[in-house]
Every structure is written in C-alpha cells, then in structure tokens.
C-alpha cells in the first residue's frame, strides 16, 4: 500500500483540490482511499452551519463512505498558521498524536493521502521547534508537490523541491495548478521540469468546484506512477 502526502509551495496553491481529485480518481480504480488533514484552520460559516472547507470537500466529492471522525487531527477557527491558530485557542499540537493517527489509518485503508497545511516550513508550535516538514520526515512517506504556474513559481517550486530532496524525502511528482495559456506560464513549467525530471500533471483553473466530478487525470505521468506503485505494492 502506498500512502503519501500532498504538499504545496505556499498556501492556497490548490492542495485540497488536488487531494480530492487524486482521491476520486484512485477510488475510480477500485482503491480504498481516505484523505487526512492533520491540521486545518479557518472555520467557515454559511449562515446556517459552521464547517471547515478541506474536510467538507473530501466528504462531498468522495466516491466512498469516509470516516468523518478520522479525516482530521486538529481544527482551529482562525484562518492562520497552525501554531498561531492553536495558540489563540489555548491549545498545543501534539505531532506524535498526528503520526499515530496516520499509522492507524494506514492499517485500514489502501491509500491514505495526507494533506499538508500551507508550505513545508509552516510552524506547528509557538516555539518554532517543529514544522510540517519535520512531521513529513518522521512519517517516512513520499510526497506530491502542488505548485502554481504564475510568475514566481520557479523559485518557490525549486526551493520546495530542494528542501525535500536534501532531507531524502521521495517526491512522487508535481501538480501544476493554474492557467497555462501564456508563453511565460508554459515556460515556467518546462523550466522547473528541466531542473527536476519528475512525473507531473497540469490542472487548469476550473470554472466551478463541481467540475471535479468530471475532470479526469488518468493518462498523466503522475497518476500512472501512482497506479503503478499501487499495483506493485498490493
């Protein structure tokens, strides 16, 4: 069984969308998949009820029944870095408990997709002793990196990949999320791939979130790699 992380070069690069998309497409292949968000921040109120966007996305678009109680470790109301959001509520994030929860999920599901919060160096405690990257290292799981296509993405993506590779974390591939119509955006993608020859897929900006129902990623080099790993491990 191959479990993995979905991490981003920054916040709001599309990690939740990609996590949900990978979940759905793997489920279509008959794989039992659950997403897991160790820490989520930013409670949303729609006038009737309060919810968290990330885990709500998982449940809404999953093709399989998910265990709501085990989709998330910590949820904090403030839309902020986990360490600060936790501090506002007088809490501390127990990373060992998160790792334990991940391990338990791995015993139940074929694939657990762990979605990161923000970028790799997001702090998880007020002292700055533990970052998301530290948890990824300790989990010993590979990663899929989500990045933008816009100006600035080359630097952000290469820094992220360097941080991962120097810590000997396996990178399964890249997801380029955003517009791809301009020569600059296309060149950004090709330039990054010149530095790191990795499986990848591109996702254009979809008009509606519900478009995820029909969007297929089968045939992309990244998805083919994930499927091959699933087949070889199972």
Swiss-Prot record:
GO biological process per UniProt: biotin biosynthetic process
Cofactor(s) needed: Mg(2+)
Pathway: Cofactor biosynthesis; biotin biosynthesis; biotin from 7,8-diaminononanoate: step 1/2
MF terms (GO), sorted A to Z: ATP binding; dethiobiotin synthase activity; magnesium ion binding
Active site: 37
Keyword Magnesium among record annotations: yes
Residues noted as binding Mg(2+) in the record, renumbered to the chain: 16, 54, 115
Function: Catalyzes a mechanistically unusual reaction, the ATP-dependent insertion of CO2 between the N7 and N8 nitrogen atoms of 7,8-diaminopelargonic acid (DAPA, also called 7,8-diammoniononanoate) to form a ureido ring.
Protein name from the UniProt record: ATP-dependent dethiobiotin synthetase BioD
